[in-house]
C-alpha cells in the first residue's frame, strides 16, 4: 500500500503516495500540524497551572504517516489512513498510570472543514516510566475525488483536541 512521509514540522508537505497494483497512486492530501495544537499540557483539575507539581500530562506530536488509495472501481473515493506519532510524559499530578489523550483529524479544503474526527488515545505508563512514544491510528478518512479534484485539493489538519484554556496557553507560549 502507498505510504506518505513521516516528517516533524509545523506544516508537513506530502511527497505523494507510492504506486500500487501497477498503477500510479492518486495524489494524497497534505497533512498539517497546527503549531498551537501540536502540544498538550494538562494540569490537575482545579489548579491554576502555575506550578510544575500541577502538571498531569504533557503531549507532543512528533510525526504523521499513512497511506491513501482509491476505494472503488469508479475512482471517486479516496481512503486516507492516518497514523500520528506522539510523545507523552506523565506529570507529577497524574493520579494513575494511564491517561486518555484527546486528538483530532480534520479534512479541510482551504479554510472550510469538511469532516472532523475526535478521538482519545489511551496511554499506559509502565512502572517507573515517565515518557512513552505512542502511535494513534490508523484513522480512516474517505474523501470525494474526481478527475478534476484529486486528494491534493484537501489538507488533513492534525492536533490535540484542546480546551479553550489549553489553546490560549499554547498561543501565549508561541507569542500569538
Protein language model features and the residues they cover:
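N-terminal intrinsically disordered, cationic/polar leader segments
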Residues: 23-24, 63
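Bacterial N-terminal signal peptides that target proteins for export
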Residues: 1-5
Amino acid at each position: 500500500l502507498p505510504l506518505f512521509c513521516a516528517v516533524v514540522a509545523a506544516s508537513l508537505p506530502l511527497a505523494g503516495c507510492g504506486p500500487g497494483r501497477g498503477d500510479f497512486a492518486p495524489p494524497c492530501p497534505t497533512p498539517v500540524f497546527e503549531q498551537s495544537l501540536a502540544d498538550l499540557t494538562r494540569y490537575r483539575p482545579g489548579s491554576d497551572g502555575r506550578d510544575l507539581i500541577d502538571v498531569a500530562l504533557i503531549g507532543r506530536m512528533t510525526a504523521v504517516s499513512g497511506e491513501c488509495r482509491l476505494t472503488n472501481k469508479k475512482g471517486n473515493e479516496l481512503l486516507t489512513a492516518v497514523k500520528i506519532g506522539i510523545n507523552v510524559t506523565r506529570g507529577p499530578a497524574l493520579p494513575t498510570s494511564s491517561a486518555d489523550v484527546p486528538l483530532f483529524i480534520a479534512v479541510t479544503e482551504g479554510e472550510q472543514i469538511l469532516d472532523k474526527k475526535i478521538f482519545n488515545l489511551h496511554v499506559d505508563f509502565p512502572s517507573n516510566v515517565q515518557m512513552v512514544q505512542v502511535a494513534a491510528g490508523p484513522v480512516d478518512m474517505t474523501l470525494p475525488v474526481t478527475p478534476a479534484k484529486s486528494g491534493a485539493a484537501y489538507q488533513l489538519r492534525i492536533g490535540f483536541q484542546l480546551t479553550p484554556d489549553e489553546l490560549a496557553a499554547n498561543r501565549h507560549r508561541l507569542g500569538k
